[in-house]
Amino acid sequence: MHHELQTLADPGAVARAGAAFVAEHARAAVAASGSFHFAVSGGHTPWAMFAELASQAVPWEATVIYQVDERVAPPGDPDRNLTHLTKALGPAPAQVRPMPVNDSDLVAAAASYAALLPEYFDLVHLVLAPTGTPPRLYRAIRSCRSPIAWSLSPSRTRGGCG
């Protein structure tokens, strides 16, 4: 696999390049297997990319988007990552698999969500925040020697996988 480091002029250029990258991988995955399984991170960083992605030539009818991070808040709440994801994508007809963070039994909800996940994702989008996330992520990747297990975060204010 070829890796390339790009330096882009501004956040808008990053959003456009990210959207083009996702769209290209979506088309390739659908051509190869008939579907595109895309895991997306939370936070505000990817919102502009998702807005750009909505206008790209993406095979939306074959695209399934999975959340890997969510806050426990009512549907439509501005603290919810899902609120911003669906707003940014607009009318794009992708199938979005929201995390069931408002269920009364979050352990059962996490197990239910895990059952929906594909064995492999075609693409995983992660946000590396300036708050120290990159070093933790890199340590986790280096130490990962077995398949990732999906789990509920111990915090009742955020859901996630790890």
Language-model segments: which ranges?
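Local beta-strand N-terminus motif with an aromatic residue
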Residues: 62-63, 121
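Short internal beta-strands
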Residues: 64-69
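Histidine-anchored nucleotide/phosphate-binding helix
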Residues: 49-57
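Short active-site-proximal "capping" loops at secondary-structure junctions
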Residues: 44-46, 71-72
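Glycine-rich beta-strand-to-loop/alpha-helix junction loops that act as flexible
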Residues: 40-45, 126-130
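N-terminal glycine-/serine-/threonine-rich phosphate-binding loop
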Residues: 1-38
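Short helix-capping segments at alpha-helix termini
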Residues: 56-61, 91-92
